[in-house]
């Protein structure tokens, strides 16, 4: 988590996305800069994942935990999810390329933007500390959740139902806390710089999405079929190799 949140702390470099805020202009593609570098945690991160595979948790019970952070994890929490969930909290599913306070992504984006643009107001790191406090609590809770999932391994439908319900309940409670943090941060900025500062942020966020990326049409069904074929072929090869070894062992005996 610390690695994916890293913004070149402890080095002689500064995050590239801080360049414009420092009055140094917009980074130019292909141009070398001795000070500003591209950090792991940057505004282009849409989601951050950590996959924690656990031998003791069978595949029928999720196989392990995926820790998910929407947007850049700089000031966002990683929530734990099992691989057998059937649905996610509504705030994850909000669509749109403009700020929307019902969206988990846009809520985190707003918090990150406020911290980045007004570092003097948030230099105490209280927001990051709150995220880490939540994560520490969930890490402790995961031990019990793992045992519950293992106990339901022979009932995969029940395991999925429980994992889904717990995941949505945790996300709902967390999103309420994120909204409180967002409002507190916005109020702090408004008190110091006026409400117009928040409107400026709205305009900047919307302007950042005026240029659309033209995606080339791609047949994802084809690549999925190819992937399944490759996986099946690999499984057959492994089976044949193991069978050959077993036969060879019997002949040696």
Range-by-range predicted roles:
Residues 1-221, 248, 252:
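C-terminus-biased signal that marks the final domain/tail of proteins
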Residues 235-253:
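C-terminal membrane-anchoring or membrane-association module
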Residues 221-241:
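Selective detector of the "anchor" transmembrane alpha-helix that sits immediately C-terminal
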